């Protein structure tokens, strides 16, 4: 009976020894992993304290963003800011991204849960090739674990690149809420003060005759300008902050009309405003031709000009509508 007991005791001791030996490399690897993670976080915090948007090249991107371990998210803006790239949108997007990163860096909620970084094409073209990226600017959120999903790529053409819109997207992807604080802009108050001063000066100079305040033509023109601005999508631009236009980085072709019905460019607003103004002017000419007391020749010319303006600008307007709402069956003169 002693021999089996001795045998089983030796087996138990050997099993415990093997278990302890197997745990030693695992514990050592865990400590090494924690040390690497601590070094990466410390390095990122040091850079973020100096500059909220960390500039990265290929080596930094692979080591700090792609390679594990990570317990932080990195929102990376891929851009092309060099002058010879002629990317106007990249400059505008960079300004908004800097505002967002500064708002996070100097907020009371600032932690090491999320960092902001930037990869310029001329400093990290290998990163663009690695990610099969062929357009800029592009915003991607790299989560702490796993690869970025489709929703981790910011829809720039739909949302625009305003800091507030990017902050909402970041809150959806990381649960980190950032309150955007913009630097004070005194242009608006100065222009308002100048406008009030001009109006006050006119009222003072014409204080003996205030009939101009009851001028129907003046009020009608002001109301028409307001209506044209609102119907062209100016308020949407103010809320979303879209780019002025989009330049294809490969062909250099500039698009002023967005191809989707869910978004628009600032230039598109100006074009629609111009077309609406042309249709309005044509209608005014037609009304004047029908009701004025001028001779028949001038009235005929006004009628022809009015019809031409309405037909031409309405046809252009309808062609823009067809380009944005694919499958729309109707057209007029132009397709």
UniProtKB/Swiss-Prot annotation:
Homology family: Belongs to the OST3/OST6 family.
Task performed by this protein: Accessory component of the STT3B-containing form of the N-oligosaccharyl transferase (OST) complex which catalyzes the transfer of a high mannose oligosaccharide from a lipid-linked oligosaccharide donor to an asparagine residue within an Asn-X-Ser/Thr consensus motif in nascent polypeptide chains. Involved in N-glycosylation of STT3B-dependent substrates. Specifically required for the glycosylation of a subset of acceptor sites that are near cysteine residues; in this function seems to act redundantly with TUSC3.
Gene name per UniProt: Magt1
Protein name as catalogued: Dolichyl-diphosphooligosaccharide--protein glycosyltransferase subunit MAGT1
Gene Ontology biological process terms, A to Z: protein N-linked glycosylation
Matches recorded under PANTHER family: DOLICHYL-DIPHOSPHOOLIGOSACCHARIDE--PROTEIN GLYCOSYLTRANSFERASE-RELATED, MAGNESIUM TRANSPORTER PROTEIN 1
Annotated disulfide bonds: 87-90
Pfam families: OST3_OST6
Induction of expression: Induced by low magnesium levels.
């Amino acid at each position: 009976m002693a021999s089996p007991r001795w045998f089983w005791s030796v087996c138990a001791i050997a099993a415990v020894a093997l278990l302890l030996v197997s745990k030693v490399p695992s514990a050592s690897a865990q400590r090494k992993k924690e040390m690497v993670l601590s070094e990466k976080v410390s390095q990122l915090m040091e850079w973020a304290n100096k500059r909220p948007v960390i500039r990265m090249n290929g080596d930094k991107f692979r080591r700090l963003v792609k390679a594990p371990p990570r317990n932080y998210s990195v929102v990376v803006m891929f851009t092309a800011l060099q002058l010879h790239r002629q990317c106007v949108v990249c400059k505008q997007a960079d300004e908004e991204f800097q505002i967002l990163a500064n708002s996070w860096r100097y907020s009371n909620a600032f932690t090491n849960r999320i960092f902001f970084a930037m990869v310029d094409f001329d400093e990290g073209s290998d990163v663009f090739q690695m990610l099969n990226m062929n357009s800029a600017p592009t915003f991607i959120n790299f989560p702490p674990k796993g690869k970025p999903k489709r929703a981790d790529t910011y829809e720039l053409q739909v949302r625009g690149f305003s800091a507030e819109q990017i902050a909402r997207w970041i809150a959806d992807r990381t649960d980190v809420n950032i309150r955007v604080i913009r630097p004070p802009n005194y242009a608006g108050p100065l222009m308002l003060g100048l406008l009030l001063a001009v109006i006050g000066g006119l009222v003072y100079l014409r204080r003996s005759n205030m009939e101009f305040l009851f001028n129907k033509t003046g009020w009608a023109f002001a109301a028409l300008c307001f209506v044209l601005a609102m119907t062209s999508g100016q308020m949407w631009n103010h809320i979303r902050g879209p780019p002025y236009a989009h330049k294809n980085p490969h062909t250099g072709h500039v698009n002023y009309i967005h191809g989707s019905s869910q978004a628009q460019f600032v230039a598109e607003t100006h074009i629609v405003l111009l077309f609406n103004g042309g249709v309005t002017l044509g209608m005014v000419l037609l009304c004047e031709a029908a009701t004025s007391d001028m001779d028949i020749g001038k009235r005929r010319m006004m009628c022809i000009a009015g019809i031409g303006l309405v037909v031409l600008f309405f046809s252009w307007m309808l062609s823009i509508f067809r380009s944005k709402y694919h499958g729309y069956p109707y057209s007029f003169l132009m397709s």
